[in-house]
Amino acid sequence: MTTRPQPDWEDPVGGFRWSNRILILAIAGILFLTLYPFRFAFNGHLLTAASPFFLEKPGKVSGKVSGKVSGLSDDFLNVLLFVPYGFGLAGKIRKRGKSPMAALAWTFTAGALFSYSIEFLQFFIPDRDSGWEDVVTNSIGAVVGCLAFQYCGLAVFQLLSGWERAVSAFATVRNTAIVLLLYFGVWFAVSARLQKETALSNWNSDALLVVGNSASGQSASAWRGKVYGLEFWDRAIPDEAARRLTSAGAPGPLDATALAAYDFLGSPPFQDARHFLPALSWAGKVPESTDSNGAVFNGDSWLTSRDPVSNLAEDFRRTPQFAVRITCEPTEIQGVDARILSISKASGPPNLELRQQDSDLVFWFRNPLSMQRTRMSWTIPDVFAAKQTRDILFSYDGSNLSFFIDGTKRRRTYELGPGAGLARAIRRIKTAELEGYEYIFYALVFVPAGCLLGFTWRKMPAQPFARFVLVVLGFVLPSVLFEIVLFRVGVRAISLGNIGLGILMACAGSLWINVGHNLKEPMKSAAEAPPK
């Protein structure tokens, strides 16, 4: 005879409703952490070079899958990742009256299939590695979650159901308004502090402007190629204007609104057409031949200012936005690791650096966040080709760094928001994960608020106007105010996308906490609950 698990006494279905919530949260977390950034490359050569169904990456040697290296810490995290999934799934299976052994078998099978599906999809994500070891460790994690449910699942569900009833009783409109005012007040202050770390407040005023090398003057970092023009702005350039500027061809015309502009025509010293920055003259071994259509760099010489560009640093600290455009042509792309542009001193980290690394372009600029624990360079692949001109523009609005090349904006952006600042306090952040940190940060801020609003929503099922006011004041207004606060800090532009993200996260929290509830009926009070 099959024994059904004992449900929560106060609400016969309330306890096991949490199995749905835990399972939804686990699946969402697993998909985000394993498939981010959700950019799939279904290249034909991958399918011919390896078998994705057997999780074999190209380069398989002696029966071993190349590129997948894991240690004990990775295995532990893979197990831990699937524990909530196994816990929630076991609750759903046991609610249907299945035996503990049946629940264990079903959880292991579902965990293995889910993990395999993820590993299969990771095969088509360039920054991810697939491997059977992840399937094994994830399946073990699902089993551990199932065993945890067998041991303490009902007690956990009863505890969560009791907490839910207490919060629901507390979540009157008045109490919710007071809590949210205090809650968002704290988050606004924390977010403003974190956002300030993306400003250009720590730029050195005594740095030199160098083209073709860095201020250290090391021959190993000297660049080979040709530069036609260089421009600076102390503001971000709108996307349409940036596309227009970089699609003009080489050498492109100088923009009349630029703060500083060099066209490298004629003979050195090259003057700034706006007379804002000092002239650039040759350093190292002065080249014997010159080109009237651009400055030629042979790896032994480079251009540098004799005086620091202190006014540029002061302007960037004040705004604090910038844009830089350079039109250049590399001589070669094999075995190259050289500086094309640098605002730097003879020693120490530069203010800004743009370098060629084979065919890749690497960009870095100084701010309090990028100076902590990791260099946070942005590497953009396959930008250069030998003896082909590239019109390049970077634009930074105080939070997002955008890249334009030859009239096209690259899809990915380098996003420095409060999420990156919070992540830096916890771990060594990675440039490829910057956008993901923002999603996590907005979830941390707005999902809990959405849960509280979801409790309040239950109390007004027959009040359309009251619900409308709740949506405007509870879901929409905090997200708008949050973006305004970060804008008022003075280091980022207002983003409608971020406002929408905050609203979406709040709605997700409200929907999640109401999983299994019939919101058309009023919430029963404790006095109306079934007797024990």
Question: What annotation goes with each model-predicted range?
Answer:
Residues 1-16, 93-103, 153-172, 459-468, ...:
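Membrane-interfacial, low-structure loops and terminal tails that flank and connect transmembrane helices
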Residues 35-76, 409, 413-434:
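Extracytosolic (periplasmic/ER-lumenal) interhelical loops and adjacent juxtamembrane/interface segments
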Residues 58-87, 132-140, 433-449, 497-504:
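Membrane-interface loop-to-helix entry segments
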Residues 112-143, 195-199, 476-510:
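Interfacial helix-loop-helix junctions of multi-pass membrane proteins
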Residues 170-231, 235-319, 344-348, 356, ...:
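Extracytoplasmic low-complexity segments
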Residues 324-326, 387-397, 401-403:
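Short tryptophan-centered beta-strand motifs in secreted/extracellular beta-sheet-rich domains
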Residues 339-367:
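Glycan-recognition/cleft segments
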Residues 365-391:
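Short, aromatic/His-centered strand-loop micro-motif at the edge of beta-sheets
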